[in-house]
From Swiss-Prot:
Family listed: Belongs to the NAD-dependent DNA ligase family. LigA subfamily.
Name assigned to this protein: DNA ligase
GO molecular function, one term: DNA binding
Encoding gene, per UniProt annotation: ligA
Organism of provenance: Burkholderia pseudomallei (strain K96243)
Function: DNA ligase that catalyzes the formation of phosphodiester linkages between 5'-phosphoryl and 3'-hydroxyl groups in double-stranded DNA using NAD as a coenzyme and as the energy source for the reaction. It is essential for DNA replication and repair of damaged DNA.
Length: 691
């Protein structure tokens, strides 16, 4: 990016402002992308202040991509969810050289690379190697070269809009440069804080009498999630681009290394510590080379990342679960320290898992002060022979989650105490049970336990469960934290005045949620069973239970032998179901749902008897929008009553159930003389099956 040859005089404010913007952006590019600063800080500040003055005097000269627009705007009330057009996937991890060798072998096998008789790869795969930054993954969207949106990774599918905060980061260009500008480009990368900037930030915090940050990652995370972008603007954040989401209007580079080279031509900051290597030997050489220089790098990293370089080979390998087969994160060994174990408590997770947690004398390890560490499970405590009072080795696994590695036996005091797993949940008093062949003990009060409350409510409301539209995690958080909802049954007591009192919950949202709760009262037995959140009981098992028993009470009272007769239900699943219904707290909530909530479903006779009633063997077609039921809920109710639900109308169709905005299916039914029912008429047919 060349320096502007002619400096316009102050008497020409439009030209002067344009020149100042170009000069400041050129200086940013030289500093952050080229790492070759050529403008002293004082001179940069002088030009910046001059541009601010001109734009204040001539507001019509302000442009969206002006460097002055990075300083932050009004405080936001919250972060808006953003659904990623292309998921931001996580990577599989490797911790040892053997993991890398195995990864290379899997990749070579997947690409049908040549091997010798001993199985050694003789046609090495080409990889792109990069650093794994210890920061926050984000996605930047550019449209026609202009920055328009930034979002966090979130759960990989949905993140949060942090556009105004990202706009304040000088390393990120607001306008792309170069000739190959795409119509749309999602840049994936990492927001981080350099070590020198972190040290200066903590100096400022100390001088202001404010709390210091534990490490650069925490500082970056806290800065990026500020509701007031002015605070973010005051924090020294940086950025490196390393991946891509959506691309439209330009050709995708053939290689990953080519992508990063292209990014540099667009003015995006890309880390120079990268290489293209061949085979496992090349991967390990890069890893160990970086490891030797890790402490001298100007930023924190927790490993390196390997990616198959050729794009066509990446496509051939594809993905498994939520991670690509063509990439691996190779983590550095975690850092360790010695401290004293003061006590062992148990923690109840969102799914009821009981985890022993070590309470420690504070120790600084892996860049953070650690006072608690996981002991994983009861078996691990026994295997490692860890006792209260021991001196223990603490490790930050993956540099994030502290764990107790082992006890230092020659320092064990005479009064060291063995850990005993409690028999009752510390949160709700329900029984703690451990299934055969499982390492994790669990609280059995799934519908009642406060620690599991949010997870139970969230699962209960899922689309494949009772499908309560509008009951998202943030609303559940408020309902639980304000003690408005303790169990799923309490949802059906929520009133309009209660809902509109929630933070950022308008009248329309309240009415929609109440309508959704009303619709949720009419469900199917299979959906209801699935909604209970019984461990090991997914949609398929819930349907098998409903089909086998026909109604809920026989399932609740079934002994393990009877449960084992259900299709695909083995000993572990049967024991889990039996334990769930044996817990009186769960039975109480179920009765409240049936009585207070009036949740109903069509019931049928137990298998193997054929479905009875007017819909047995009948073919029904659904069309339009029903007043209280979703299409999926209506379909399941009809199928539970023995009907076959078809997607198109023909002479073999017995009934058409039509709602609002019914289209060609309704017209064809009328043409063929097929009986047309509304939702009320459908319920009339189902009366012989309803509770």
């Amino acid at each position: 990016m060349a320096r502007s040859p002619v400096e316009p005089p102050a008497s020409q404010p439009a030209k002067r402002a344009a020149w100042l913007r170009a000069e400041l952006e050129r200086a940013n590019y030289a500093y952050y992308v080229l790492d070759q600063p050529d403008l002293p800080d004082a001179e940069y500040d002088r030009l910046f202040v001059e541009l601010q003055r001109i734009e204040a005097e001539h507001p019509d000269l302000v442009t969206p991509d002006s460097p002055t627009q990075r300083v932050g705007g009004e405080a936001a009330s919250g972060f808006t969810p953003v659904v990623h057009d292309k998921p931001m996937l996580s990577l599989n991890n490797g911790f040892a050289d053997e993991d890398v060798i195995a990864f290379d072998k899997r990749v070579a096998d997947g690409l049908d690379k040549a091997t010798d008789l001993a199985g050694t790869v003789t046609e090495p795969v080409e990889y792109a190697c990069e650093l794994k930054f210890d920061g926050l993954a984000i996605s930047l969207r550019y449209e026609n070269g202009r920055f328009v949106q930034a979002s966090t990774r979130g759960d990989g599918t949905t993140g949060e809009d942090v556009t105004e905060n990202i706009r304040t980061i000088r390393a990120i260009p607001l306008t792309l440069k170069g000739k190959r500008i795409p119509r749309m480009l999602d840049v994936r990368g990492e927001v981080l804080m350099f070590k020198r900037d972190f040290a200066r930030l903590n100096e400022r915090q100390r001088a202001a009498g404010q709390r210091e940050f534990a490490n650069p990652r925490n500082a970056a995370a806290g800065s990026l999630r500020q509701l007031d972008s002015k605070i973010t603007a005051s924090r020294p954040l940086s950025f490196f681009a390393y991946g891509i989401g959506v691309l439209d209007g330009a050709d995708m580079p053939d290689t990953h290394s080519g992508l990063l080279d292209w990014y540099e031509t667009l003015g995006l900051p890309v880390n120079r510590e990268r290489a293209v290597v061949r085979g496992a030997a090349g991967l390990l050489a890069f890893f160990h080379s970086v490891g030797e220089r890790r402490e001298s790098l100007p930023y924190d990293i927790d490993g390196v990342v390997y990616k198959v370089n050729r794009r066509d080979e990446q496509d051939r390998l594809g993905f498994v679960s939520r991670a690509p087969r063509f990439a691996l994160a190779h983590k550095f060994p975690a850092q360790e320290a010695l401290t004293k174990l003061i006590a062992i408590d148990v923690q109840v997770g969102r799914t009821g898992a009981i985890t022993p947690v070590a309470r420690l004398e504070p120790v600084f390890v892996g860049g953070a002060t650690v006072t608690n560490a996981t002991l994983h499970n009861e078996d691990e405590v026994r295997r490692k022979d860890i006792r209260i009072g021991d001196t223990v080795i603490v490790r930050r696994a993956g540099d994030v989650i502290p764990e107790v590695v082992s006890a230092v036996l020659d320092r064990r005091p005479a009064d060291a105490q063995e850990f005993v797993m409690p028999t009752e949940c510390p949160e709700c008093g329900s029984r703690i049970e451990r299934l055969p062949d499982e390492a994790i003990a669990r609280c059995t009060g799934g519908l009642f336990c406060p620690a599991q409350r949010k997870q139970a409510l969230w699962h209960f409301a899922q689309r494949r469960a009772l499908d309560i539209d509008g009951l998202g995690e943030k609303i559940i958080d408020q309902l639980v934290e304000q003690n408005l909802v303790r169990t799923p049954a309490d949802l059906f007591n929520l009133g309009f005045s209660t809902l509109v009192g929630l933070d950022r919950f308008a009248e329309k949202s309240a009415r929609n949620l109440i309508d959704s709760l009303e619709k949720a009262k009419h469900t199917t037995l299979a959906r209801f069973i699935y909604a209970l959140g019984i461990r090991h009981v997914g949609e398929s098992t819930a349907k098998d239970l409903a089909k086998h028993f026909g109604s809920l009470d026989p399932i609740m009272d079934a002994p393990i032998d009877a449960l084992l007769e259900v299709n695909d239900v083995g000993p572990i699943v049967a024991e889990s179901i039996h334990q769930f219904f044996a817990e009186e707290h769960n039975r109480t909530v179920i009765e409240q749902l049936r009585a207070r909530g009036k949740v109903t479903w069509p019931e049928g006779p137990p298998a193997p008897r054929a479905p009875q009633g007017v819909l047995a063997g009948k073919t029904v077609v659904l069309t339009g929008t029903l007043p209280t039921l979703t299409r999926e809920a209506a379909k399941e109710m009809l199928e539970a009553a023995g009907a076959k639900v078809a997607g198109s109308v023909s002479k073999k169709t017995d009934y058409v159930v039509a709602g609002a905005d019914a289209g060609s299916k309704l017209a064809k039914a009328e043409e063929l003389g097929i009986p047309v029912l509304d939702e009320a008429g459908m319920h009339t047919l189902l009366e012989g099956h309803a509770r």
